[in-house]
Amino acid sequence: MTATLERRESASLWARFCTWITMNENRLYIGWFGVVMIPTLLTATSVFIIACFAAPPVDIDGIREPVAGSLLYGNNIISGAIIPSSAAIGIHFYPIWEAASLDEWLYNGGPYQLIVLHFLLGVCCYIGREWEFSYRLGMRPWISVAFTAPVVAASAVFLVYPIGQGSFSDGMPLGISGTFNFMLVFQAEHNILMHPLHQLGVAGVFGGSLFSAMHGSLVTSSLIRETTENESANNGYKFGQEEETYNIVAAHGYFGRLIFQYASFNNSRSLHFFLGLWPVVGIWFTSMSVSTMAFNLNGFNFNQSVVDSQGRVINTWADILNRANLGMEVMHERNAHNFPLDLASNESLPLALVAPAING
């Protein structure tokens, strides 16, 4: 009997890299989307941290009055922010090599574009990575679908809204007080509180919080005890066990009697699908509202729409909201606008009807 020994061909470096990238047994799954996700998110995070501490003031309004947002320039954690790119740049792509110098790039708010664009690309790849990992494990794709909600919300305020308004200077600043400033100005300019898509989004977020609290409390209140009275109920379960840990029939019966029968689910799959669907669809609606208002399809305006038989205005909540909007409009960008257009919308009064005669 003759035995033939052949040298096993070693896999190429590329083949080993492909195997390692797509291996399910890694402590952290990388995947092909992760190849793009990791460097983009690391870049966005690194530039964000550096800019938070040391970025120089940015001429956000394009009127040569720079606004400081970093900690080294007198801000704290609450007031600090990454200031959006200058209105002088508009929606032009503004990488470092487009500026004459690094100082000019910083003065015009280049770090904001760098952070936002890398961040959005990174989180989109995170969606793809979730789908890829689920596919390789034989799971269904709903985890990646659910994560589209925060991604489209971020895309709406960081990308779609600036494009619709014509400048990255209208994007949301990357900071706590900057976020609140963005919300107030958005309300003043677009009346978002009266936009039906935003109202659906509020119902989705608050409803999702309510349903999550209700579900969690019902589950923890109807655990199937596997231990004695002298031992914690938490000790009777194993991670990944096949047996149910709580009695859904008991939870369904309790909640059905607490409200009414059809207000509760008796099917675990439909229950959890609803819990995932409600907030995700709500955030989708909110993102759509911001995206439509980016192109000035604003919220409803019912100002002075209720009058009595004499034609006198009966002030409603819409009129109060309008006055608040005007106040916020006056306060923001006070150096860029001498007189808000909203307050100058009435008919102009003639100051001189006839030119004076000059007798020389």
Curated annotation (Swiss-Prot):
GO cellular component, one term: chloroplast thylakoid membrane
Record keywords: Calcium, Chlorophyll, Chloroplast, Chromophore, Electron transport, Herbicide resistance, Iron, Magnesium, Manganese, Membrane, Metal-binding, Oxidoreductase, Photosynthesis, Photosystem II, Plastid, Thylakoid, Transmembrane, Transmembrane helix, Transport
Binding site for [CaMn4O5] cluster: D170, E189, H332, E333, D342, A344
Presence of the UniProt keyword Electron transport in the record: yes
Residues that hold a quinone according to the record: H215, S264, F265
GO biological process, alphabetically ordered: photosynthetic electron transport in photosystem II; response to herbicide
GO MF term list: chlorophyll binding; electron transporter, transferring electrons within the cyclic electron transport pathway of photosynthesis activity; iron ion binding; oxidoreductase activity, acting on diphenols and related substances as donors, oxygen as acceptor
Residues flagged as site, Tyrosine radical intermediate: Y161
Transport in keyword set: yes
Signal peptide feature range: none
Disulfide bonds: none
Membrane topology designation: Multi-pass membrane protein
Binding site for Fe cation: H215, H272
Catalytic activity: 2 a plastoquinone + 4 hnu + 2 H2O = 2 a plastoquinol + O2
Annotated InterPro entries: D1/D2, Photo_II_D1/D2_sf, Photo_RC_L/M, Photo_RC_L/M_CS, PSII_D1
Binding-site residues for chlorophyll a PD1, renumbered to this chain: H198
Family: Belongs to the reaction center PufL/M/PsbA/D family.
Name of this chain's protein: Photosystem II protein D1
Recorded name of the encoding gene: psbA
